[in-house]
Amino acid sequence: MLEDTREWVPEQGTPQGAVISPLLSNIYLDPLDHLMTGRGFEMVRYADDFVGLCRSPQEAAEALAVVRDWTEKASLILHPEKTRLVDARIEGFDFLGYHFERGRRWPRKKSMDKLKDSIRAKTGRTVGKGLPMVIAHINPILRGWFGYFKHSYRPTFRIVDGWIRRRLRSILRRQRKLDGIAKLHGADHVRWPNAFFTKHGLFSLQGARDAVSQSP
């Protein structure tokens, strides 16, 4: 590298999350892309995360050997826990926030947990806040999450929608008790059906997914 026209050799890599890190990864790993393509392997890469897609265990082992040889010569170290051979028809694998398995994809567990943590953070202190305000706080989170995971396996969105509505019903029940309202009778999902939250503007992941599927 050059600094003030003087050459120097950095002893550490760029900080994780730095704006320039993906660019440097693309520049440095571009030869690996061409090598794998030239050898007939299919590889998908984003910055320094990549997966090789192979038709047999033998081909996968050969592809991994090529990658190991190249990275060693390039003075790079493969992540010991992330570097492995898997059968996507049985075990599946995580990549860029998704879990891929049997030709389908859905948010990996860590991505689901992160979304739920964000919703909990926005709905943890709701005293004095009406439902419209709570929904206004969580809708941007849901829209952003959907924007990235909208191509997930469809049942995923129904499951997450259900979890969010149960969370909101719990809040409504708690608020009624704090307001001194008499004991509630009947199931929460009957008292506050799905249409109730739709009427109050709650962003529906399932509804958004259906709209994407129907668009030309």
Predicted regions and their residues:
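Non-catalytic terminal/accessory segments
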Residues: M1-P216
